[in-house]
């Protein structure tokens, strides 16, 4: 990693009204107001949110590919790749399991579904039928096989056709191809240098494109939040407020207490990290998709002192294997349904639920509406909990989706710093400077001192 001093004086402070996080906040407020008072019109704005997410997905594959390939090809020892991946998977497995256990414990303590006395036979199962059907495709073997694309191009375009359209890039497939190509490039040595130089030269314009696309974030957040409030209404939260509130509070405590302790042990503050990522978090909140902020998260983590090779491996992998918010939601929602339908679950049933959830949460990687579909897959394997009970939470799932995405996002940001520190691939002075609000020296690609992609402010 080459660091150069900025040429000339630092740029003047950007006015608050031009900062992305302020624009996204205003957009979310306006979208919520429009959804509340003009719900019919607000529903028609859904394409704004969808279009922005498509724009971001368009650039995700190139960002991941370039970051991973240049990072791996620049490593002096290829054993480092396996070591980083192994450490990341150990971290992901531990904290994903911990999140599932936390959801289970909170459900027992809070009892959000107690006293509802719902008869599963009286519920409209047609509302959740499509989710249950999708969940049947989520198997561990199918998930592992899906990591391997049918072709190199297929990883970037999507191999499957849904409603006559290609599904788009698969993050894990792009990761798989990028790792193989990066290793191959490193093995050919000097002969691969021209290719590596070309890919490194492409990084700056690609991240500049990310910066340009992020300027449309307020429009996307406005459309997405207006649609959500307009379609589902704030009123739908009232009946299930105890469940929604329990989930939000549990996720907050998980981030501040559990992840907070991890951050403190690693020498930084989770609150400062959240402040540093405020623009991305607001974007995730507005679009209800942590994927929408993936490119800028990778950029921000590298800017904060994490080595590019570690960022390139940990962040995309974490988006599939480190879903803390989704895991909390799964066990909490499953026990809520059991309590609401007066279904008694023994300790054995709950251990089985935990084991199935550990596997099914990995099988939902990259699936739209992953939390709800994964819950359906889990309940289908644990027959004691009626799948029909999912109809109880269908109306508020969209409101819990934001919290799932935010928790997943923060969890992956923390994981990136922790694994970087674990791997001695973290510039601690730079991290401290950035989290304290300072402007660090520019990061420059090899051979191009002083040139760096514009970081999202």
Curated annotation (Swiss-Prot):
Name of the protein described by the UniProt record: C4-dicarboxylate transport protein
Subcellular localization: Cell inner membrane
Keyword Transmembrane listed: yes
Record's function text: Responsible for the transport of dicarboxylates such as succinate, fumarate, and malate from the periplasm across the membrane.
Membrane topology: Multi-pass membrane protein
Gene Ontology molecular function: fumarate transmembrane transporter activity; malate:proton symporter activity; succinate transmembrane transporter activity
Major site of localization recorded for this protein: membrane
GO BP terms in the entry: L-aspartate transmembrane transport
Family to which the UniProt record says this protein belongs: Belongs to the dicarboxylate/amino acid:cation symporter (DAACS) (TC 2.A.23) family.
Keywords in alphabetical order: Cell inner membrane, Cell membrane, Membrane, Symport, Transmembrane, Transmembrane helix, Transport
Residues spanning the membrane: 22-42, 55-75, 90-110, 138-158, 168-188, 209-229, 242-262, 335-357, 376-396
Coiled-coil regions listed: none
GO cellular component, as recorded: plasma membrane
Phylogenetic placement of the source organism: Bacteria, Pseudomonadati, Pseudomonadota, Gammaproteobacteria, Lysobacterales
Stored NCBIfam families: PRK01663.1, PRK13027.1
The UniProt record lists the keyword Cell membrane: yes
Pfam families associated with the record: SDF (PF00375)
Gene: dctA
InterPro entries xref list: C4_dicarb_transport, Na-dicarboxylate_symporter, Na-dicarboxylate_symporter_CS, Na:dicarbo_symporter_sf
Source superkingdom: Bacteria
